[in-house]
């Protein structure tokens, strides 16, 4: 498997259709296709490719100001159903956030998670994320979780 940075130039219709399908099949809050495309156009969406199949994708905002003066914010991460429970989400979080280690030293990594999404919360807690008392900008039922970048990638 290989991680690639998605751009409008290298994101084929087939790859984008897979990303939309993964997003639609996650069963929780989903971003519409135009928002997913905007994330790719901005330049911080990574896909884990298993040959021509998207196994996992993650979108990172490297200059988020939602909760701190500046943080790495995980906008979205989704694993295709056939690839779940294989540690791919953990690997993608650590690896892709690690790409920013030099330029974003001493920053926090933040994410919003639905309070009812217990499997995601368990994953994030296992990685060392903690629930913050900051209110989520995504909705009343979402929790903000944080971890120092250095701790996540070590």
Regions found by a protein language model. Give the residues of each.
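Acetyl-CoA-dependent GNAT
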Residues: 4-82, 93-95, 99, 103
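Conserved N-terminal glycine/acidic-rich loop preference
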Residues: 73, 119-131, 135-136
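Conserved hydrophobic beta-strand within the GNAT/NAT acetyltransferase core sheet
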Residues: 74-77, 109-113
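Conserved glycine-rich acetyl-CoA-binding loop
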Residues: 80-94, 114-122, 126-127
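Conserved GNAT acetyl-CoA-binding A-motif
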Residues: 100-112
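Conserved beta-strand-loop-alpha-helix junction that forms the acyl-donor binding cleft
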Residues: 110-121, 136-142
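Terminal substrate-recognition subdomain of acyl/acetyltransferases
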Residues: 136-154
């Amino acid at each position: 498997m290989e991680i690639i940075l998605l751009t409008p130039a290298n994101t084929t219709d087939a790859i984008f259709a897979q990303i939309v399908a993964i997003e639609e099949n996650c069963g929780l809050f989903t971003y519409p296709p135009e928002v997913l495309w905007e994330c790719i156009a901005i330049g911080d969406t990574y896909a884990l490719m298993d040959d021509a199949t998207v196994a996992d994708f993650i979108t990172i905002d490297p200059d988020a100001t939602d909760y701190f003066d500046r943080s790495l914010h995980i906008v979205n991460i989704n694993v295709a159903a056939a690839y779940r429970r294989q540690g791919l989400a953990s690997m993608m979080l650590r690896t892709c956030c690690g790409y920013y280690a030099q330029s974003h030293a001493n920053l926090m990594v933040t994410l919003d998670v639905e309070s009812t999404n217990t499997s995601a919360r368990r994953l994030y807690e296992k990685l060392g994320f903690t629930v913050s008392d900051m209110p989520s900008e995504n909705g009343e039922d979402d929790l903000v979780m944080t971890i120092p970048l250095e701790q996540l990638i070590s």
